[in-house]
């Protein structure tokens, strides 16, 4: 017994009670229960009489003996259920020797919990009636018949470590749709079969066979949800064939992982699944994977990404000696027919956290060469093994392991062995002569041509596809949990503690000073009343100065003698100290006496001014008129900083960004903008600090996470970069940019599988968003003006615009200003010349572009137009795209077939947006130019991307940043050839000529840009620079009109200054003064503004204001010597304005 217990594990199954039973011959029949497992009868219970209430107490126990190694026995528990058949024993009739029995129903017990580490479980399973059973009509008020079952083992079948390392594979075959028309339900009956192989431990593979598919005519869709069925034949009760709590639920096509999940496939699939013939299985087969089998399974996926799933049909005939109605298959006289194969991409199962693949897969004719090329599989499951492997297998489903693996890598084959280690003949020798394999150990170049599988070719003609689901209990590659990622981010970037409510602060210090001043003034006033009476102040106007001086002396004497003056000073001392510390931030000793005296003078002036403010508040009758101050907003400061960037005044730009941070340190957008500025100046360390501070303010801010990841890559902190990117995808799974950046990171790490996973998810999310956008924009497009076609487009600097190519014949005067235009401070960042940029960042990309074919862009006429391409987001890896450049021919064909539209509309075909171009826009917006060249290479090779107008625009921007004007002009020429009427092309061209000093060409480009109906991505600097050119060429009316548009759209000191200059040159001095006053209010440190204010004041004869403006002009060191000479000339003409006269 000890030896037996150590070598055999026993599963005990006890049937305790039956409920709501009734029989053929009455409501109290005599019944017994038979237990069966794996085609073996485990035993029968004793005969029990059912009570009038329908209850039977069986208390019947049966056992399943398992081998010590588990092996096939454990796998049997996974995919074979326990059958409990309840049979009624009829009373003996006269002259009857044996008892007659009739089956009432059958119950199914799923033993899968034993493989999950459980030692015991109890369940109540329904008893499904067999056809004709009285259980089909339950008693009134009773429930469905059921059995109570207890399952237990003395010790767990698997240790916790084995449970953790093992896995369970479930394969569900739903149906094959749009099958060939030659499949007809009449005539000889056919057995429709599908099979695949699963790697197991050692040298053996398991085969999964799905048999007896049900051929149906079209007419309606298969219902969902519908139950999954056991892949087992000869189940007596129809209801027992359904797997408990397992259903086929379907889902949107776009969420599938197969081949027919694109928008263009929707119509075909709807038609195929509603109106066309189909073969339905709805079977689920399981396979228990031991820890070693899990490793083998994972390795096979990595080695052979595509797995073959074969489909065929075999005729069934009625055998002469068989029982009536029993079908058997002829062994040798009929070949396989309609032998096809579907290729299942199993790679997604190696993605982190992925446990399921479900999708529709095309069926192709089975050809040895093609199958081997795609799957490295040498043998056909059906053809090379013979029909007998599936012929009489009543249990069906997962068969025993074959004697030799059916799908092996070529390098694993060992030719020359006629038998395997167990002495069994080779698989090729087992097959029937009529279906003998045409393949052999010879090279596959001699395989039969396509014409030898004409039946399989019908699958392609009919568009046949199978719907299959492959599911694992546990993911092969664990995925980090969001909680773990959030914890890791917190460890790297601790959240900023909330600011404590400070009782001090500069404003509070000044307020306390005002309070003390008011208190002391009241005390002094009370002392004055005590000495001279309350009527004194009313008669103050009648008192002469001598009397007033005498009273002041008496009051001072009294305050000093009484000690009140000293008390007032002590009362005020603490408030003054707080102002020094909080307002002036002085907490340490001064380095020199001169510095101390300077500070005391400044402090004295401030205290006196604030004393006057407090006294004026205390005496309302004497409140003077206050001068209103203009407080610039955060958006204005960002615009000013942006202007300084473009003009290469980086110190001034940094000052504006820092001012925004001082004003709103808790606003993460301010930190992101400053970080983007640091990226522009290539200060990566400070940029990282800014992005991390933004992330500390909001740990769930996706853009901050992405930018931290980008900086981590640039600084080669790859482990941190992965944490940031993964956390971003967890927080916002629909973010296309997050998935794309994660894929680019994995590409840097040479992790091809995860790279494909990330790009695949990005494609999927972009496809779903494109469909939603298309539905929302349909009505809008229909309501547009005739002759104007609007396409959603992104400008090259990341600002979303409505891009139309219809051109307006009116000039600038006919433009419709958009007063509600919101300006982004980083929408034109590529126009900022970098002071020091890497000269080799794009060299490899430039070389690659030089070798790329240019015939496509050169063949397009400037006004050529075509139909917009629908986004066909093929789910494939970027690495695979590099190997499939031949697919670019499809793009060329689409472009070559583009028709020319009527010349009155000028509609340009817009290419579909790709995940890479969307990522490029994000990176350009934040000035991450160092990372852009890698994404541009992907965009060039992407089937939905390739050379496009926006692609060449981005290239032009990157070279414009380096002041590589020759390359910039070359790429702008390419962009203009692809979209001649794109306003962004002309805008960047204008910037190119402006920066290179060719103002005549720049003027022409800017004028063309502003003549379009829809603006370019960034109009602010187009107006500024065009106005500047007009001023240079003394076209003051055009300059005035241009600057007025700029002031309406996005007012700044420079726009008002330009307007003021134009008005001054037109002798419109009042308008000039107003414009210059606006400019001065926005920035009172601009020397040019003070210079023109001085000129205006000189012209209108205001000497004091002229001198004051001239002083500030000199103090701020005006650099325009010509303007300074003009001021001197006017000063000499009018005779005033220069204090040195």
Curated annotation (Swiss-Prot):
Main location: other
Spans of repeat TPR: 634-667, 668-701, 702-735, 949-982, 983-1016, 1020-1053, 1055-1086, 1087-1120
Name of the protein in its database record: Cilia- and flagella-associated protein 70
Similarity-based family: Belongs to the CFAP70 family.
InterPro entries: CFAP70, TPR-like_helical_dom_sf, TPR_rpt
Top-rank lineage group of the source organism: Eukaryota
Ranges of biased composition (kind: Polar residues): 434-443, 816-827
Keywords attached to this entry: Cell projection, Cilium, Cytoplasm, Cytoskeleton, Flagellum, Repeat, TPR repeat
Region (Disordered): 392-448, 811-874
Subcellular location: Cell projection, Cilium, Flagellum; Cytoplasm, Cytoskeleton, Flagellum basal body; Cell projection, Cilium; Cytoplasm, Cytoskeleton, Cilium axoneme
Tissue: Detected in ependyma, trachea, lung, testis, and oviduct, but not in whole brain, liver, kidney, and spleen. Localizes on the epithelial cilia and sperm flagella (at protein level).
Residue ranges, compositional bias (Basic and acidic residues): 409-427
UniProt note: domains: The conserved TPR domains are dispensable for ciliary targeting. The N-terminal half is important for cilary localization and/or binding to the axoneme.
UniProt lineage: Eukaryota, Metazoa, Chordata, Craniata, Vertebrata
CC annotations in GO: axoneme; cytoplasm; manchette; motile cilium; outer dynein arm; sperm flagellum
Originating gene: Cfap70
A Pfam match: TPR_8
Function recorded in the entry: Axoneme-binding protein that plays a role in the regulation of ciliary motility and cilium length.
One annotated GO biological process: maintenance of cell number
